[in-house]
Every structure is written in C-alpha cells, then in structure tokens.
From Swiss-Prot:
Assigned protein family: Belongs to the G-protein coupled receptor 1 family.
UniProt entry keywords in alphabetical sequence: Cell membrane, Disulfide bond, G-protein coupled receptor, Glycoprotein, Membrane, Receptor, Transducer, Transmembrane, Transmembrane helix
Protein name per Swiss-Prot or TrEMBL: Probable G-protein coupled receptor 19
Native organism: Rattus norvegicus
Gene3D superfamilies, A to Z: Rhodopsin 7-helix transmembrane proteins
Gene: Gpr19
Membrane spanning stretches: 70-90, 103-123, 153-173, 183-203, 222-242, 278-298, 310-332
Pfam families linked to this entry: 7tm_1
Amino acid sequence: MGFDHRMETDQPPVVTATLLVPLQNGSCVEAAEALLPHGLMELHEEHSWMSNRTDLQYELNPGEVATASIFFGALWLFSIFGNSLVCLVIHRSRRTQSTTNYFVVSMACADLLISVASTPFVVLQFTTGRWTLGSAMCKVVRYFQYLTPGVQIYVLLSICIDRFYTIVYPLSFKVSREKAKRMIAASWILDAAFVTPVFFFYGSNWDSHCNYFLPPSWEGTAYTVIHFLVGFVIPSVLIILFYQKVIKYIWRIGTDGRTLRRTMNIVPRTKVKTVKMFLLLNLVFLFSWLPFHVAQLWHPHEQDYRKSSLVFTAVTWVSFSSSASKPTLYSIYNANFRRGMKETFCMSSMKCYRSNAYTITTSSRMAKRNYVGISEIPPVSRTITKDSIYDSFDREAREKKLAWPINSNPPNTFV
C-alpha cells in the first residue's frame, strides 16, 4: 500500500532513487527488476550502458595510441604534401591541359579534403578516448568520410571511360575539357546528395562519443547496403569491365600486328604506360576502401568500446593509405610528373636540365630570363646545288638547332 501510495503521488525522483538502491547489490537484482516499471527499467539499462561506455573509454593501451598516432601522422604528412604537389605541378602545366589533368586534380582535392576535414578528428578521438567536439561536428566528420571515396571512385570511372575511348575508339568519341569538367561536377554533386543521410544516422545522445558505424536498425542496414552497391560495387564492376576491354585491345594489337604493323604506332607507348599506372591506381584504391565498406556492413555493436575503436581505426588507416599512395604512384610511373617536380623545386640560382624534345645543355642567363636562344650550326660548303632543296626534307638538318624552352610554358604533366 505504501508503494502504491507513493506511485500515486507526484514524486518520481523519490521512487527512482528508492528502487535503484537494490541494484547496487547483486543479490537483489531480480527483486528490483520485478518492482521496477517498464519505463524505469529502460532508463536504468540505458544509464548502466552509458556508464560502462565511460569506463571502457580508458582501456586503450598507451602503446596502441602511440602506434596509431605515428602511422596516421606519417600518412597525413605524405597525403598533404603529395597531393598539394600534384595540384601545384599540374597548375604549372599551362601549355596543354589534358582531360586527365582535370581528373587527377579532382582526386587530389578529394584526398586533401579527407586529410583536413576527417582524419585529424578520427585520430583525436582515438588518442583522447572520447569525442569532445559535439554531435554536429561528429556528423560533419563522418559526412566527409563518406563523401570523398564516392567522389574518387566515380572520377576513376570517368578516367576509365576516357582511356577506353581514347585507345579503343579514338575517332568515335572524345572526352573534351568541357565534358571532363561536367563529369567531375556530376561526381561531386550527385555523391554529395547521396551521402546526406549520414547527417541523420550519425551522432549520439551524449557529447563524449561519436559513433563509428551506422546503427544496426533496418534503416541503417538498408542505407549501408545501398551505399555499398551504388558507391562501391557498381562503379568497381564497370571499371573492371572497361579496363578488361582496353587490355584485350592492346594485347590483340601487340600480337596480331607484330609482323604487319611493326612500323605503325597503333597505340602509343605513353598511353599504354598511362593505362598501366591508372590500372594499378584503381587496384590500390579498391583494396584500400574495401575493408571500410565491409566493416560498415558488419554493423559491430559499439558496446565494446575498445574493440570498435580498434576496428574502426584500422580500417580508417587502410582506407586513408590510398590518399598517400596516389602521388607516390605518379612519381614512380610517370616521367613527366617527375620532371614537373624537378621544375617546381628548381630555384632561379640552380641549373635545371630538361629531357624534353629540345636539346638542352645548360641554362644560361638568357634562358633564366625566359628568352629563347637559338644557335645554328654553320653551313657546310656545298658542291651540289640540290643540297639546299634536300635539306628541307632532311630531319637531321632541321634538328641541328639548339633552343631553350620558355619557363612559362612547361610541358604537360600527364599525357
């Protein structure tokens, strides 16, 4: 009767405090659960789960935190420096801006965006063991973490389409500069709209934690599957199919036309090297971001803070490694990019050597002032009057001129 009387009076805090006292004793848990109403039981379960969450935030070893910080710091430096260098080198190539340059700059900007707007905050959460920037910032960080891979994979698909028509059907369709710009803009705008549900799924009820994974509800599961198919599986399959056709075409030309077309340049070697570079770039990107999507499909429950934190940090590090690997691949497989880096780091007091179509020996003071100097070989005495006519068709005679190229028009970076 006393219990019923207290329930009828408007004193819920007294009831809550009275009924939560037996919960401190393990032998009285069943009796307390029988007395607690359904709403108060849910309140107690949520309170105990959040308390366990707070306790588990301090279970990370200092060695784990230090190791993750070192690896993330190294990748962050490589990504910031490398992708900034890519943008700078291509910006200096003002003579002929190819469509490939636009795609490469777009991917470099996406890598810089995730390096600035997402990765530092993930490392901060891992090292401090809690989220101290609020729920709104949590949504923004997770949004950029979903935005950048979707943009990059569709830009890679655009590069694949460009390479396919450039090599297999060079006369039927051409990706011009305007088409490349529209393809890049469509990749950014459509993917930015596609990942907007992240703002509704992420965030938490308290300010000390930012959810790592999408919620295991049917809405979260449905969006995870749709995002995995549209943002990863479908473009990956299209990329594989296009490159398969390109490789088959190059292989067929190399085998069937070896005897009949030995002197004909059907597929330029530079384009074949570019295809190899982007093929390797696609493989690195797909294998780097696959663990992230698998972890999201797995939907691990975040009641074990240590496990979820380690899993999320590992898959984030693997996915972020693709941002640092792109400039490395450019410098290894593209001689023009290496030449552009040398020209970028070359100071006015240094001597720059270019392995270009020009024959360059040393950079004189006249060349440093962006003047073009031409020195001709003195003509040899002719005994036959027809030699002057033949010289106009003689390649060696026309190439006996030495010229310094103008620094304001450096060569194209990606061919």
